[in-house]
Amino acid sequence: IRTHTLPCKCTICPKAFSRPWLLQGHIRTHTGEKPFSCTYCNRAFA
């Protein structure tokens, strides 16, 4: 039984999230965006 709503819906796939920041992180899986980089090894991460 779900006790919360999922108002933030992905426009690319059927997934939905309860928080906007969760959706924002999920969208990166579709776009390939990696905005965070390690200052030690320079690898980029989502």
Curated annotation (Swiss-Prot):
One of its GO terms (molecular function) is DNA binding. GO terms for cellular component: nucleus. It is found in: Nucleus. Transmembrane segments: none annotated. Pfam families: zf-C2H2 (PF00096). The keyword Repeat applies. InterPro entries: Snail/Krueppel_Znf (IPR050527), Znf_C2H2_sf (IPR036236), Znf_C2H2_type (IPR013087). Belongs to the snail C2H2-type zinc-finger protein family. This is Escargot/snail protein homolog. It comes from Tribolium castaneum (Red flour beetle). The lineage of its organism: Eukaryota, Metazoa, Ecdysozoa, Arthropoda, Hexapoda.
